[in-house]
Amino acid sequence: MFNLDNPFWNTVSKLCDLVILNLLFVACCIPVITIGSSITALYVVMRKKIRNEGSSVVKEFFKAFKDNFKQATIIWLILLPLGLLTIYEMYLMTWVELSSLAIIKYVFFSFLIVWILIVSYVFPVAGRFDNSIIGTFKNALLMSIYHLFPWSILIVGVNLLPWFLIFSASGLKLIYIQVMCWIGFTIGAGINSFIFEKIFQKYIDAKEESN
């Protein structure tokens, strides 16, 4: 019963790792400015977990957080104001009923879609490949478009579903928030990590063949 190598305790250990990782991620996102490096570290650790690599979740998270802090923070500080500005402009336009603004609304909506795609890809890409900030943005955008159906749509769906549930289900709002705070982010990152590994491996194999 207390054999730590049996399936039951292995499952308990993995669940504990997911909870610890989720709590670390949430705590490190609180300063806001560190959200980019926190997302990157989350995906780095989740990739190692699904590949059965690495050891301590805490050690691996803070190592990835530190290693990617500069680049991921710069990327986040570029994306954050762009996203907020786009959402704010779209909100203002909902109060204006002018046919002449219809095209502008579509432009902002299209930009928001591109922004969501980039945010969904750029931090996992930053944690997987060594590249410049511009190169990371470029690769994230191209990958998200190239793999739009079905992978990018699925990734975005996994990312947005919890927020949709939180903001749409008032009666269960607190329950959804608690789930996200305890284990929700790691579950989402885990699902997406399987997809990203499938996507990234194609580029890794192609690079190895070219060499």
Regions found by a protein language model. Give the residues of each.
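Helix-coil boundary and N-terminal low-complexity module in membrane systems
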Residues: 1-108, 115-211
